[in-house]
């Protein structure tokens, strides 16, 4: 009986790994020298291509803690778009090698009625009513300012000009904004930009 259970767990594990490998087939990563270029590239490409901002795996990280995951079929168009906007990525890498799996930037967890969102090194905690209880992490000079401006406020009452990307000026503000997104008139926590309060 124990042998059958072990085989069952091994079988399930193999399927999970196979599914993860298939999810990366046909995808690539754009590696940038600095976060400014990565952020500009995202804003230029997001409406035209299926892209996602991720953290590059440590083995290939160069200069910047952000990379863009994209569909390989779009590589020619993406390269042309970046070139016409004077953005020069360090390299384009195929993700067909599963060992180069990018790291998810956003992790969402619910604990005792609080929603905890970690995006990169930034963390934001929100209660059931949508009130921001805490903002921490990152180590950037604008984190205390962001916490001062946003802590205690309800995410549904925060206007576009008061979101982290508009209040701050560093990678921390950008990352914190990735952990939160403006949807119509209410700010919502995102996990693949869809989880809402």
Swiss-Prot record:
Short name of one Pfam family: Se_S_carrier
InterPro entries, A to Z: Se/S_carrier-like
Tree of life domain: Archaea
Protein name: Uncharacterized protein MJ0011
Organism: Methanocaldococcus jannaschii (strain ATCC 43067 / DSM 2661 / JAL-1 / JCM 10045 / NBRC 100440)
Lineage of origin: Archaea, Methanobacteriati, Methanobacteriota, Methanomada group, Methanococci
């Amino acid at each position: 009986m124990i042998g059958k259970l072990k085989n069952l767990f091994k079988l399930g594990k193999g399927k999970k790994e196979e599914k993860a490998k298939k999810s990366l087939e046909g995808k690539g990563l754009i590696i940038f020298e600095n976060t400014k270029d990565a952020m500009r590239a995202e804003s230029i490409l997001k409406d035209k291509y299926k892209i996602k901002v991720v953290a590059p795996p440590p083995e290939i990280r160069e200069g910047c803690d952000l990379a863009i995951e994209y569909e390989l079929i779009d590589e020619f168009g993406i390269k042309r778009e970046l070139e016409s906007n004077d953005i020069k990525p360090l390299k384009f890498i195929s993700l067909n090698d599963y060992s180069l799996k990018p790291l998810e930037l956003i992790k969402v967890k619910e604990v005792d009625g609080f929603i905890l969102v970690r995006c990169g090194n930034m963390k934001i905690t929100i209660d059931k009513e949508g009130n921001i209880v805490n903002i921490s992490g990152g180590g950037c000079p604008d984190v205390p300012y962001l916490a001062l401006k946003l802590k205690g406020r309800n995410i549904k009452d925060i206007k576009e000009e008061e979101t982290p990307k508009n209040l701050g000026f560093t990678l921390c503000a950008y990352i914190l904004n990735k952990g939160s997104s403006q949807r119509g008139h209410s700010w919502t926590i995102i996990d693949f930009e869809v989880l809402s309060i």
